[in-house]
A protein has these predicted regions:
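Conserved phosphate- and dinucleotide-binding cores of soluble alpha/beta proteins
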Residues: 2-24, 28-37, 42, 47-53, ...
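HTH-adjacent hinge/linker in prokaryotic transcriptional regulators
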Residues: 7, 14, 51-125, 137-145, ...
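Generic hydrophobic alpha-helical segments
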Residues: 23, 104, 108-112, 135, ...
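Short alpha-helical
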Residues: 70, 130, 134, 293-296
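Glycine-rich beta-strand-to-loop/alpha-helix junction loops that act as flexible
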Residues: 124-131, 290
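Structural beta-sheet core signal
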Residues: 126, 149-151, 181, 287
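Short Gly/Thr/Asp-enriched flexible loops that form oxyanion-binding sites at enzyme active sites
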Residues: 131-142, 228-238
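A generic structural motif
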Residues: 145-147, 177
Length: 324
């Protein structure tokens, strides 16, 4: 239909913009199809397409997403831009508490489902802690025996007591995948004890698998009197205080970090057995965390490039952005 109104009119100037505005209004606001608009304006569908494209090019259209997730999408974009992240996902905060770990763990599970659904073999490095445990419980059963799950840190105290955060075994079980735990103390009694552990063939084999991991996923800890690393018995009160005096605001894989994302000069670090990250992160390294107390630690890790991906909730996202 090419001999209609549009062809008889002057296609240039203000009249063309008026037609573009009308076509865009019918398409976006009234929900008409391009065929319906073509019949109403007495032009071809091809011209309707050009008119809508012109309306967009001339910025005649402004979109507003009317959904609660819109603010989460905006927060994720702001975090991505602020910290130059390779991935960021912000979920709705469904709790009135200062910590909404269940929602964040669920969101992280959706992310891992998509990543782990691939057929090609992959290795994923996993941190420890309550948030990671929540993720391992939420992941649905998947038959991926070709995938490998490797722990990035130990889960034993100096006196031999294990924690309840056996994340790697649980997640590998859900995947029907290969499991590589790290059954050593998080912090040893002495440097010599740590060096003895690192000299074992099993440690070197595990270290090689960690180096091959294409994705690292971990929680992050608050640093203070209620710090998980201290409450679970991995470090002493004196070690906690010494790191705090050195400027620690958070903990990543057992490592105390400052507000600038720098690993502080904590004495226990020379006895820490976890696989310390490179700085900046050299592969997708995702922090999954929620809570007002963790916000300074999250901001520090992202600012210091210890991690380059984040999954969190909207309240925590606001706090991290405000801290910057």
């Amino acid at each position: 239909m090419s001999s209609g109104y549009f062809e008889r009119a002057d296609p240039a100037g203000e009249h063309r913009l008026e037609l573009a505005a009308r076509a865009a209004w019918l398409y976006y606001f009234k929900g008409r199809t391009q065929e319906q608009i073509a019949n109403e304006l007495k032009v071809s569908r091809q011209i309707v397409q050009r008119l809508i494209a012109l309306a967009n090019a001339e910025r005649l259209i402004r979109f507003q997403l009317m959904h609660p997730m819109a603010k989460c999408i905006e927060l994720a974009e702001r975090l991505r831009d602020r910290f130059d992240l390779v991935y960021c996902d912000v979920c709705l905060t469904e709790s009135n508490n200062k910590d909404d770990t269940p929602s964040v763990a669920t969101q992280a599970t959706f992310y891992l489902e998509k990543v782990l659904d691939q057929v090609a073999p992959m290795t994923i490095g996993l941190g420890s802690g309550g948030t990671m445990r929540e993720i391992s419980h939420r992941l649905p059963p998947m038959d991926r025996p070709q995938h490998r799950c490797v722990s990035l840190m130990g889960n034993i105290t100096r006196d031999g007591r294990a924690t309840h955060y056996d994340v790697v075994t649980r997640l590998a079980e859900r995947l029907n995948g290969q499991c590589y735990p790290f059954p050593v103390p998080v912090v040893t009694h002495t440097v010599a004890e740590k060096e003895l552990l690192q000299a074992q063939p099993g440690y070197n084999a595990l270290s090689a698998i960690v180096a091959e991991a294409s994705l690292l996923v971990m929680g992050i800890g608050y640093w203070g009197p209620e710090a998980t690393l201290y409450k679970d018995g991995f470090i002493t009160a004196a070690e906690l205080g010494q790191a705090m005096a050195a400027g620690a605001v958070g903990e990543l894989l057992g490592c105390a970090i400052s507000a600038d994302g720098v690993i502080v000069g904590a004495d226990y670090h020379e006895r820490l057995t976890s696989f310390i990250r490179t700085q900046p992160a050299d592969r997708p390294t995702t922090i999954v965390a929620s809570g007002v107390y963790r916000a300074p630690a999250i901001r520090a890790a992202l600012h210091g490039r210890l991690a380059n991906s984040l999954i969190t909730d909207e309240n925590t996202a606001h706090l991290v952005l405000d801290l910057n």
